[in-house]
Amino acid sequence: MTELNIDCLNLIFNELRKDKETLYSCLLVNKRWCLLVVPILWEKHTWNFYHDEAEKKTIDGIITKFFKDKKFKDDKRKLLEQEIYKLFVNECKNIKEMDLYTSQPLSLFQGASTFFYNVKKLSITINCILPNTLHEMAKFCIYLNELIIHNCSQYNSGLISLIDSQKNLKIVSIYPDSKAGTCKELGKVLGRKGNTINDLSLYSINIIPLISLVNLKNLLIYNFELYDINSIEIKRFRQYLENSKFSNLQILDVYGLSCFKELATLIKNTEENLLEISIITKYVNTNNLEIFINSIANNCPKVRDLSIGITSKEFILIKSILLNCRNLICIEFDSICYENDIIGDEILNYLIDYSPKSLNKLILSGNWKYSIDIFKRFLESCRNHKLILFGITYEIFITDDHVEIARKYVNEGVIDEFKILYPSHTSHSYI
């Protein structure tokens, strides 16, 4: 049977340029056809947001229908997957971001050294990758700026090798496996990259020992497991916090932890460089909260964004924060315990008397009571320094009268926006 030459095939495929379904079917004829069709299909990437939804669904549907077809056996499915990855690795020379979520041995494919050499941001799902893949990648994937690790387990020698090989690793995010324990070796290898890493996100307190990174500027710690205050994990993490020193730290974001004494020590050791502090915790032991708030007031003169919880015992310390932290742009004060409903007016009075002129965003708890007179007096004081946003989380004690007063000041241009906010600030009403 006579085969069409390349020129003829190119003419035919170009005529079919708008018929994506036919072009996708041509991918499966043979390798020669596949090599000619791919450049045409990839002239516009499927992730280009200018594509309309109908076109995106068509493209995605065609390329995945072979994998979902019951008649398409597993061995053929794996073979097709492998050929697609081979083509991808060999032909794409300037990929900067990569999400590695496959058991295919990509590091062994032709062109892998060039492909991975140029990758700057890599996201890997550990339990989906062959053990030797990361070892092989460590030979040529050495210029990552950002590494995101999913399903991190107790120990993975390939991951250790990959991190050890990096020349300029700056950002690391670690998400744990549900059964993972502490991986000391991972902590050690990150410590060896302390001169370059400036952004660390830990989505569990039980993944690695918290190491001191000399150039760390951003630190995020999420206790999603919500370990009990007396658990071994919390006690161990308290020690890590107390012994850690991040003198260049600028952003501290902590969720689900109430280690206030240790956090106070950490803040003291930042040498007054903190610009953003967010400590979110609810229904927990508030021991040492006063020490923590005092540490902010005494050691954070440059802080611009502040989000913390308080109780009726500590609200008086707000004055010292407002007096000492004169660069504040955004403040969020939340109620840790619901018995604090009486302190709303006192907080507003402190804000009236001591707010820095730089303040333009304010979010307060709706679990506190605000008298109409003080609420109005506070908004009147905003004529001296305009608020871009005034928000109330929840609205337990916010009445229609409060809303009407706020609307009046929005209409007069004293504040740009008033919002009732809900958990995570993802759902809100506008005025």
Where on the chain are the PLM-derived regions?
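N-terminal adaptor-interaction module of cullin-RING ubiquitin ligase components
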Residues: 1-123, 128-148, 153-173, 177-184, ...
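Short linear motifs in intrinsically disordered/low-complexity regions
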Residues: 8-11, 49-61, 70, 75, ...
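Concave beta-strand-loop units of leucine-rich repeat
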Residues: 99-105, 123-130, 148-155, 173-180, ...
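Leucine-rich solenoid repeat modules
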Residues: 295-300, 305, 310-431
